[in-house]
């Protein structure tokens, strides 16, 4: 007798081994029809999976996140099937699920065209309507290699050859197409009804620029048409908000080929930078961080001690001088340990908090660069806390409060907190990991927040808390982290004198709230579609005169506002006032002041708020009060 335990606590008993699909049918015909996969004892499997012992089972449908992943993975295979039908000489390589969709890489003798994409999507629809069963077959590795070589799929054969010889591999077949895959997949192609091919791109085989350039086709797939339409609408909105376009349109910054992955900040953009940096500097000061500055370039010997030279050198910019090797720092932590080591420390000094606006450089592949979101040079609000194990929870609790206050000030209210736990490959004892993970859980419980745990996602040296912001389009951005590191202080010789007069190694907490300032500003630009709140706006007020008769008064008003700390643009051009208003409105300024004869004579100003909102005529002092209140409220 086999007992199958269901999520609602009920049980089903079967005399013989039973498939997931059969259990679903036993529960009800509706569930049997909706079933896409199953979760047996925590593992997602095909509906054809045979349950041979007492097990926990959840039936996966398109209402589950795992079900959407199965749909997308299966649609990637459907894409490859369609390409092989239309272009038999194309070779298939890999096709994983990604956020909101999937991609598949192909090798083909000519570039695919947008017209090809239309034809491929049409063929996918035809194949899906056939509702062909998707079947799984397991075979020995060498047999699988021989099979793919026999059908001319050299890339698949190469992938399988990298698998240990004693391992079996699984193949999935739908119609005439067979692919290597772990699975799981939908039971038949008819389950794939809502999908769209999005774009073409290039990708190196195995991500190595020394290898052949393949052709990557991106797609998206959903359970319901309405969900896909909402996603495509979000993409349209995201395109309008693209920080690269807005950065050029609003004269914030630019990029050019002579400096890939680096930013040329214009005066307006640099003003935004300064507002963010100054705000974060006050966060340091208000929370007892000592601001420091470590060198940009450090000797190879230090990077060897930290392990970066052996494990991260490909991502570092390296140089030589006078027969010594150096690297531009890709991160700030080793420099902070050196500052800590510059003096003898006592337990009375701990916790010791350092903060730096540290400029880092990482040699990211050119194909991975993306505006300000992925760069080669960036500055972090990077802090490190040296403390004892007993102080971890209190420090993390305090950091959490700081981070949440910062996100609220910048206009982010929807924050997901995630706890990344020990990975398979790690250093340290199980006991040290237990202590570190429980310290973070204890801190989060003390904060009264809910969180999601991510098993296996921690760094090799310690667990971390991640902060994921959702922007105005519902997109998630991982920005802040606080991470426990018991390793680096010891590798670099950091010590403190304990209560019992022995030497001990401190724990180091890596913490950042906004992370890369460049990336965070890019997120802000897209979140607000360039219409930054008053306190961040590079130009807060434009002062416009209607004619030369008001020029002197307009200058006096502008000067008055500047003296009170506002960022003001004075526009005395001899243009029609409607033209000037329209031009400054396009620049998304928070406020526009218009001055005519009436305002000049009465010593007032006519005020327009962003969005062409007419606030009427008011004295300058009243406007100043309004502006200061808005800035103080970070509204």
From Swiss-Prot:
InterPro entries: aa-tRNA-synt_IIb (IPR002314), aa-tRNA-synth_II (IPR006195), aa-tRNA-synth_II/BPL/LPL (IPR045864), Anticodon-bd (IPR004154), Anticodon-bd_dom_sf (IPR036621), Beta-grasp_dom_sf (IPR012675), TGS (IPR004095), TGS-like (IPR012676). Its main location: cytoplasm. PROSITE patterns: AA_TRNA_LIGASE_II (PS50862), TGS (PS51880). Its EC number is 6.1.1.3. Gene3D superfamilies: 3.10.20.30, 3.30.54.20, Anticodon-binding domain, Bira Bifunctional Protein, Domain 2, Threonyl-trna Synthetase, Chain A, domain 2. The keyword Zinc-finger does not apply. Keywords: Aminoacyl-tRNA synthetase, ATP-binding, Cytoplasm, Ligase, Metal-binding, Nucleotide-binding, Protein biosynthesis, RNA-binding, tRNA-binding, Zinc. Zn(2+) binds at residues 333, 384, 510. Its cofactor is Zn(2+). CDD domains: TGS_ThrRS, ThrRS_anticodon, ThrRS_core. GO terms for cellular component: cytosol. Residues 242-533 are annotated as: Catalytic. The keyword Membrane does not apply. Catalyzes the attachment of threonine to tRNA(Thr) in a two-step reaction: L-threonine is first activated by ATP to form Thr-AMP and then transferred to the acceptor end of tRNA(Thr). Also edits incorrectly charged L-seryl-tRNA(Thr). Homodimer. This is Threonine--tRNA ligase. It comes from Janthinobacterium sp. (strain Marseille) (Minibacterium massiliensis).
């Amino acid at each position: 007798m086999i007992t199958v335990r269901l999520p609602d606590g009920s049980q089903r008993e079967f005399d013989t081994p039973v498939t997931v699909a059969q259990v679903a049918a036993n529960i009800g015909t509706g569930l049997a029809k909706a079933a896409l996969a199953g979760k047996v004892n925590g593992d997602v499997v095909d509906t054809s999976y045979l349950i041979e012992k007492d097990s926990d089972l959840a039936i996966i449908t398109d209402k589950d996140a795992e079900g959407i992943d199965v749909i997308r993975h299966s649609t990637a295979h459907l894409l490859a099937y369609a390409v092989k039908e239309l272009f038999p000489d194309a070779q298939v390589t890999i096709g994983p699920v990604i956020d909101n969709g999937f991609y598949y890489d192909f090798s083909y003798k000519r570039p695919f065209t947008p017209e090809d994409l239309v034809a491929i999507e049409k063929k996918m629809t035809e194949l899906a309507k056939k509702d062909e069963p998707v079947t799984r077959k397991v075979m020995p590795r060498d047999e699988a290699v021989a099979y793919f070589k026999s059908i001319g799929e050299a890339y698949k054969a190469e992938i399988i050859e990298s698998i240990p010889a004693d391992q079996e591999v699984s193949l999935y077949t739908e119609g005439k197409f067979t692919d290597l895959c772990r699975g799981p997949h939908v039971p038949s192609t008819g389950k794939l009804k809502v999908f769209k091919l999005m774009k073409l791109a290039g990708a190196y085989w195995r991500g190595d620029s020394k290898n052949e350039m393949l052709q990557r086709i991106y797609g998206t797939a959903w359970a319901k048409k309405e969900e896909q339409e909402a996603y495509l609408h979000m993409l349209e909105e995201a395109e309008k908000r693209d920080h690269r376009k807005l950065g050029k349109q609003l004269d914030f910054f630019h990029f050019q080929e002579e400096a890939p992955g680096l930013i040329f900040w214009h005066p307006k953009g640099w003003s935004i930078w300064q507002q963010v940096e100054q705000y974060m500097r006050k966060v340091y000061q208000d929370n007892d961080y000592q601001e420091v500055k470590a060198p940009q370039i450090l000797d190879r010997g230090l990077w060897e001690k930290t392990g970066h030279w052996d494990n991260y050198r490909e991502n570092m910019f390296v140089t030589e001088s006078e027969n010594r090797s150096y690297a531009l720092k890709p991160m700030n932590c080793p420099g902070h340990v050196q500052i800590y080591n510059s003096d003898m420390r006592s337990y009375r000094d701990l916790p010791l908090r350092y903060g730096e606006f540290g400029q880092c450089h990482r040699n990211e592949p050119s194909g991975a660069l993306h505006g300000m979101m992925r760069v080669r040079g960036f500055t972090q609000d990077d802090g490190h806390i040296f403390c004892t194990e007993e102080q971890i929870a209190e420090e993390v609790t305090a950091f959490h409060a700081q981070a949440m206050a910062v996100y609220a000030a910048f206009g982010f209210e929807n924050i997901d907190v995630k706890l990344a736990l020990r990975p398979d490959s790690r250093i340290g004892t199980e006991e040290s990991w237990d202590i570190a993970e429980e310290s973070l859980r204890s801190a989060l419980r003390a904060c009264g927040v809910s969180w999601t745990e991510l098993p296996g996602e921690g760094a090799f040296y310690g667990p971390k808390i991640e902060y994921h912001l959702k922007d105005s389009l519902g997109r998630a951005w991982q920005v802040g982290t606080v991470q426990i590191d018991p390793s680096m202080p010891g590798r670099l010789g950091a010590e403190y004198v304990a209560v019992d007069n022995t030497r001990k190694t401190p724990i180091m907490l890596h913490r950042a709230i906004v992370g890369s300032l460049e990336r965070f500003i890019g997120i802000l630009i897209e979140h607000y579609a360039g219409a930054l709140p008053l306190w961040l706006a590079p130009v807060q007020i434009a002062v416009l005169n209607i004619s030369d008769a008001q020029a002197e008064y307009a200058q006096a008003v502008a000067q008055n506002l500047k003296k009170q700390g506002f960022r003001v643009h004075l526009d005395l051009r001899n243009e029609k006032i409607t033209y000037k208003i329209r031009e400054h409105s396009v620049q998304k300024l928070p406020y526009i002041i218009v001055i005519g004869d009436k305002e000049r004579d009465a010593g007032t100003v006519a005020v327009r708020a962003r969005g062409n909102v007419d606030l009427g005529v008011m004295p300058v002092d009243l406007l100043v009060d309004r502006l200061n209140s808005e800035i103080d409220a970070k509204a």
